[in-house]
Amino acid sequence: MSKVIGIDLGTTNSCVAVYENGEAKIIPNKEGKNTTPSIVAYTDKGEVLVGDPAKRQAITNPEKTIYSIKRIMGLMMNEPNAKEAQSKVGYKIVDRNGAAAVEIAGKVYTPQEISAKILGKLKADAEEYLGDKVTDAVITVPAYFNDAQRKATQEAGTIAGLNVLRIINEPTAASLAYGLDKKGEEKVLVYDLGGGTFDVTVLEIGDGTFEVLSTDGNAFLGGDDFDNAIIDWLAKEFKDENGFDIKNDKMALQRLKDAAENAKKELSSAESTEINLPFISMGNAGPIHLVKSLTRAKFESMTEKLIDETLDHIKIALKEAGLSKGDIDEIIMVGGSTRLPKANQVVKEFFGKDLNKGVNPDEVVAAGAAVQAGVLRGDVKDVLLLDVTPLSLGIETLGGVMTKLIDKGTTIPVKKSQVFSTADDNQPAVSIHVCQGEREFAKDNKSLGMFELSDIPAAPRGVPQIEVTFDIDANGVLNVSAKDKGTGKENKITISGSSGLSDAEIEKMVAEAEANKEADAKKKAVIEVRNQADALLHSTRKTLEENENAISEDEKKAIIDAAADLEETLKDENATKEQIEEKLKTLTDKSHKLAEAMYKKEQGEQAGAQPNQKAKKDDDDVIDAEVE
């Protein structure tokens, strides 16, 4: 059986490893380095350069040199991050069927195609090192990558000629490399600050089991943002002195980017650095030079909010894991940007303990991917990896409520089912609207997709049994099916590709969910009592119509009047929960005589009002489904 390689496809740099002779080994590239710049360039001669050769010519070829492509993987052009991404790069980002792509010399390339060039080089380097053909790989992604981004990564692997056996999260991969030989039980926090993404994951490691307890992060927070802070500062200083924006010059922007990256690296060990860019532009009086001194203190002041945000994600991850900072045994720093002194200082002060520096931050993720490859190949025994889904998943039900089937933090792979029903009599079809997020209402969450189950036999509301099943595989790809249990008819949808969430949207939803928790709860309570009232009206009128002679005319009139009163209240969109409940109670009270008559007539079968049932984890529960 051929070797299976592990690949860390990074925003700034990528790395490849293999598991052999009982350990993960980093494979050097043809240039003799353990990491390869995630840069692709197209030259005027028609050559395609990847890695260091592409990086070396970037300043003289800015519009045809593609870097940080990972930031637009699976990104839709109508998402805020697309516009921001264009303002930070020298190449052109364009709309390709709604998705972000790049245009080079009039030709459009997808992020998958560009990423495939990087993966192709890593594959070739691995084949040269191993002396054998490589086809299978495990590729890592940020823990907060959405469905579209994960799918795009898989497609990039396919384009590169790789069979992607598994997509795993970067912090989880790092924990595999760290904890493979650990014997005791530990609670570990992985702080992964890379070139373009940030993830924090809390795991419990012990006896070969790696269980993710929680994860949080931002796929648009990383080393690029620290570079951009310096670039923006330099551009502002230049504009203040010269009166125009130097960033409009693509070649000058590339020089600023290189200078900012170098300054950031120098400030990791020095207290100050000089940025010297001669002939950066031309003015009326001749050439303009840009020379600035930047201190570490100034740099840390400019990027303080970025570091503080990483702490916010740590706090969320700890809360969701049900742990305090004192419960964490080890803090593992992963990603090249963890070389920033301020990042180390802030995390160390927060936990009040030393950080684990025993892993190489640039290589540990690829090493972990190689370990997972070894597990899949059978070379690594007795290792169980339990990862989680980052956000709740569910469907829209009556009143616009999002009914969750899979909660945030659920271990994957996972398959869960729940039975729903129709909201109207003789309803011929139901629309299944799949949503992702933490808010109480579907409209406040991300719509992942919609499909219809039709040809439902005519039946009273609440009778059809529609079983909805959510199935998430080990790669995080979601499949949803709906089945009429009465007829066996089924319809399915795979949630992948461009329908996924952007990470900025995920962050926003989580924050909004917390901020609007109380308001959402009140709105949900009104929806629920409205549903209850609607169901009572329906059942009471139907029962009264079928048994109008069972009670007196006065009792019948009292029920009709109470029903009309409740119906009038429901027409008022601003009616409060208490107002509806008052009218609901009146109708219930007036219907007691009818219920008693039915009880006597049918020997104990209650025919009174039945409130809508709430969704539960039990598959046999039935609740109203939203109808489009």
UniProtKB/Swiss-Prot annotation:
Compositional bias segments (type: Basic and acidic residues): 595-604
MF terms (GO), sorted A to Z: ATP binding; ATP-dependent protein folding chaperone; unfolded protein binding
Residue ranges of the region described as Disordered: 595-628
Presence of keyword Membrane: no
Modified residues (Phosphothreonine): T197
Superkingdom, taxonomy of origin: Bacteria
PROSITE patterns: HSP70_1 (PS00297), HSP70_2 (PS00329)
One matching Pfam family: HSP70
Keyword NAD recorded: no
SUPFAM superfamilies per UniProt: Actin-like ATPase domain, Heat shock protein 70kD (HSP70), C-terminal subdomain, Heat shock protein 70kD (HSP70), peptide-binding domain
Keyword annotations from UniProtKB, A to Z: ATP-binding, Chaperone, Nucleotide-binding, Phosphoprotein, Stress response
Induction: By stress conditions e.g. heat shock.
Matches recorded under InterPro entries: ATPase_NBD, Chaperone_DnaK, Heat_shock_70_CS, HSP70_C_sf, HSP70_peptide-bd_sf, Hsp_70_fam
Function: Acts as a chaperone.
Family: Belongs to the heat shock protein 70 family.
Protein name (Swiss-Prot/TrEMBL): Chaperone protein DnaK
Originating organism: Aliarcobacter butzleri (strain RM4018)
Chain's gene name: dnaK
